């Protein structure tokens, strides 16, 4: 099975991406998700096949989600989230004088 997918990046969250089938666009993505995601910024178009490797997502789960729900949400890698949380904690402790 081959799927041409459009991948959008979130302007609100670094490392968060939304995959949709190119022929369907964003039509099946719930409004609530789009609100949380922010205005989608097109990042790339990819041909997805079961043999393809993705850097931060399981291709099988991506294809299954695209077929079932019409979209796949890729969350930021855990280390990126942890690094950002640590940076915010450090900044907050400096601001509060601790």
Curated annotation (Swiss-Prot):
PROSITE patterns documented for this protein: YCGL (PS51648)
One Pfam family here: YcgL
InterPro entries: YcgL-like_sf, YcgL_dom
Domain YcgL intervals: 3-87
HAMAP family for this protein: UPF0745 (MF_01866)
Name of this protein: YcgL domain-containing protein CJA_2437
